[in-house]
Structure formats: structure tokens, C-alpha cells
């Protein structure tokens, strides 16, 4: 895991397996089926990395030999909140890693001026819960920042929120950081820039279209 000095709340997950799978996802000739499988696999690997600092407590258990105080994750079960629609493809990998997690959804689409338009919010109970929000792309950063706003407006503090994405543009990371300097943003790659259509370069195309086999 490494950081970029420009963005103190950005963490780049540079594990070789994550980078290997991301390269195959970038390839324009990767099939929908393979893209979907890779998204699940890479999200599972990234989920392992971002949960390494979860709070721990102990639980009394009896092994076949003795009783011990053994470590377990403290507090309520985690919640996974994909940003629709492409974020849904990331929830499978996270649920494979954390099968007891609660799942919410935030529906946001990008208007012609690239600003987010919210159309759906479904969340589990919020008290004392850690939330992992996920969307494959942080392009302009407005949708990601808006999704965090949804939780904060309902009283969830920044220290109980994290955002997980595959690739991000510096422009989007700056927007996210300006809006939520107290929320950690985890990505597999910080790419070069946004083009004139607000697509990430080099990026991996439209993640939703590639995941579901649709045409923009």
C-alpha cells in the first residue's frame, strides 16, 4: 500500500495480484464474463487490504483442548454500500470476504454537467456500524463525494466510512478530498487524467457497460 503526497487520504493498493488483475480488466478485448469475474476477485483482494485495521476485541471460546480469549472483530457487523450500478459488481467480492455484512444501496447517475443525481437510498441501521462504499471509478469525484454525503447527513462520522474504487483520476480525488478529508479513499490505481468527456485515462472504459454487457 502506498500514498501520493498530493492526497493524504488516498491509499493505492499496489499488491502484485491486484495490479495483475487490473491490467486484464483494462484490456478492451476482455469479455464481459471475464471482466465480471476479475472485478469480484480484485475486490476481494482489495477488501482484505482495507480491513486490516478493523477494531478487535476478544471472545471466550473453547477449543478441543482448552478455553481461550480469542480475537474477533469488535462492534456491529460491517455494511457494504455499492453505488449503483457498477458498484454492485464489487459487492460480490466483499461479501465473499465478509459474508455476514449488511448491504445497502445508493443510486446515483451523472447528469450532463457531470453532477450527481440521487435516485435511490436503501441503508441498514447506521448506529456503530463501519461502512465500505464501493464504485469501480472515481472520475469527477462528485458521485463518490455525494455517496459519502448521504451517510454523513444521517449521522455517520467520517472515521466509520471508507470508499473503495479500482481506478481514480487526480481531478476526482481532489474533489473527494476537498469534500471529505476525514474519509479514506482506497484505489488500485491513480490514473493520469480525465479526458474531455470526463472519462478516466487510461482507465478501463465504462465499468457498468463492461460489467453488464450493455452499450452506452
From Swiss-Prot:
- One matching Pfam family: UPRTase
Q: Where does 5-phospho-alpha-D-ribose 1-diphosphate bind?
A: 85, 110, 135-143, 206
Q: Which InterPro entries match?
A: PRibTrfase_dom, PRTase-like, Upp_B, UPRTase/APRTase, Ura_phspho_trans
What is its EC class? Answer: transferase
Q: Does the keyword Zinc apply?
A: no
| This protein's pathway | Pyrimidine metabolism; UMP biosynthesis via salvage pathway; UMP from uracil: step 1/1
Q: What is its EC number?
A: 2.4.2.9
What UniProt keywords are attached to this protein's entry? Allosteric enzyme, Glycosyltransferase, GTP-binding, Magnesium, Nucleotide-binding, Transferase
**Binding residues for uracil, per the UniProt record?**
200, 205-207
Q: Which cofactor does it need?
A: Mg(2+)
Q: Which reaction does it catalyse?
A: UMP + diphosphate = 5-phospho-alpha-D-ribose 1-diphosphate + uracil
In the record's cofactor note, how is the cofactor described as bound? Binds 1 Mg(2+) ion per subunit. The magnesium is bound as Mg-PRPP.
Q: Name one GO molecular function term.
A: magnesium ion binding
Activity regulation reads: Allosterically activated by GTP.
* GO BP annotations, alphabetical order: UMP salvage; uracil salvage
Gene3D superfamilies per the record?
3.40.50.2020
- Role of this protein: Catalyzes the conversion of uracil and 5-phospho-alpha-D-ribose 1-diphosphate (PRPP) to UMP and diphosphate.
Task: Give the protein family.
Answer: Belongs to the UPRTase family.
Name of this protein: Uracil phosphoribosyltransferase
Q: What is the lineage of its organism?
A: Bacteria, Pseudomonadati, Pseudomonadota, Betaproteobacteria, Burkholderiales
Q: Which gene encodes it?
A: upp
